Amino acid sequence: MPCTCTWRNWRQWIRPLVAVIYLVSIVVAVPLCVWELQKLEVGIHTKAWFIAGIFLLLTIPISLWVILQHLVHYTQPELQKPIIRILWMVPIYSLDSWIALKYPGIAIYVDTCRECYEAYVIYNFMGFLTNYLTNRYPNLVLILEAKDQQKHFPPLCCCPPWAMGEVLLFRCKLGVLQYTVVRPFTTIVALICELLGIYDEGNFSFSNAWTYLVIINNMSQLFAMYCLLLFYKVLKEELSPIQPVGKFLCVKLVVFVSFWQAVVIALLVKVGVISEKHTWEWQTVEAVATGLQDFIICIEMFLAAIAHHYTFSYKPYVQEAEEGSCFDSFLAMWDVSDIRDDISEQVRHVGRTVRGHPRKKLFPEDQDQNEHTSLLSSSSQDAISIASSMPPSPMGHYQGFGHTVTPQTTPTTAKISDEILSDTIGEKKEPSDKSVDS
């Protein structure tokens, strides 16, 4: 009987292969952990590391299984690429925290890598939303300009609102993108300060660098999440088919909880709740605070893996008729050309704005109103409302983005607007034709 394990039917054997590899890893890792416990005197530090390792072994397979399913059913790259990047956050966080818990001396280095990936996740979530909208609604700027003016949320409610349309879209994307620049920059500064001995992580004092970097990171992160929230508020109806609330909460909770619990632990050290009287096997109080943070993250990531399994499910992308290469799906996961293009676009937009040449609005605010322009304006807005009120896609498929769009079933605002425009011009010409005939 010929072997069926060929590259053409890789979907059938890739999942059993991953399961076998994971089981072998468990068989090797568990004895090593037991041997480590027997070799050392078991204390609080070692017990915490062992318990965190149990949660790590529970977390990794859940996350990797969802990632693998997305690779197997990689039918809509525009959406699944950012989803896969977001899903990698849980195993990276969990493994990073477990290593830092075991080796406190290198915690500063592995934790900074984890925090950089946090910014990367926020950027990819914004990319996930914009990719869906631009594929389903090609004239997204047109839709934004037709909407009512959105005011800022507190505490920015006193600031003038951003103009609807391209300005709002650009500033929301730029607000998220700035965090992906600020966070790696502050991470490099933190590493330099650690080498110079002036970082002093976990100690709230204006004589060290850690306090200032925490403030900068916090402000940048809050503004990025604010831009995400404002973007969702404006396009809530258009985003409803992909159920973004659960996805937004998953990203927001992981990012905010990990950050603020570090701040709370640092405050406990500052007020003396965590003191030098009980450092266990750690050398300093700050090392105790960092170890406690890493231990809690290992537990939280198990819960986050379960939440990601349901909120970022692969099931809407299952299309058995779609065949793809195993290597193409795997390599696409590491492709970052979209990030390069997005950064280039934002830089060009900033350059146009600085030079005073922004793009013209599709709906000018100051224009002479007459019967013809009013009719065209109302017709265009009707076209937008028609496209925006399209029924949600059937279960199991997200219609309207990627290569699943079919012109016969998914009309775009551009086509509808052209049809209305041609009909309007035709009606305008009818009286003149009749006068000629008479």
UniProtKB/Swiss-Prot annotation:
Span list, region Disordered: 355-438
Q: Which GO terms describe its cellular component?
A: membrane
Q: Where is the composition biased (Basic and acidic residues)?
A: 425-438
MF-aspect GO terms: transmembrane transporter activity
What's one Pfam family here? Solute_trans_a
What is the topology of this protein in the membrane according to its UniProt annotation?
Multi-pass membrane protein
Q: Which residues form the signal peptide?
A: none
What residues bear Phosphoserine in this entry? S422
Give the protein's function.
Possible tumor suppressor which may play a role in cell growth.
As for family, the record states: Belongs to the TMEM184 family.
| Protein's name according to its UniProt entry | Transmembrane protein 184C
Question: What is the name of the gene encoding this protein?
Answer: TMEM184C
